Amino acid sequence: MDIVTNKIVVEKYNFETTMEENQPFENKIELEVHEVEPVDGNVELMAKGKIFKITIPFLLALENFRIDGRISRIIQLKDFFGQFSDLEAADVEALSNPLIDYIKRITYDVTEIAFDEPGVSLDFNANHDG
């Protein structure tokens, strides 16, 4: 599959070491996908394949800190004119992994600086159940 990717955008990244006790947090990392419509009726661009905005909103509460945010990227799937849900799980994972890697990288760097010790390495496993 031929893919044109734009830069990854960190829409929001929040890091907190002060957490209120007994405040329950549900760790979550989600995948949101929205079809992008062309601006100014750019039909030529759309004729090359569907364009999607992939967004990963997340909230993770770990032992010493909490992070939350949104990271996104716009992609075009060349010669693909179906729905995003038509893609195989492996393709969806390949399209979303660079965003997950960004969350890991930012978190490692921020925790390394904040705690003045080696950063925290996050480990995510894909959930193909929905």
Task: Name each model-derived stretch.
Residues M1-N97, I113-G130:
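N-terminal intrinsically disordered, cationic/polar leader segments
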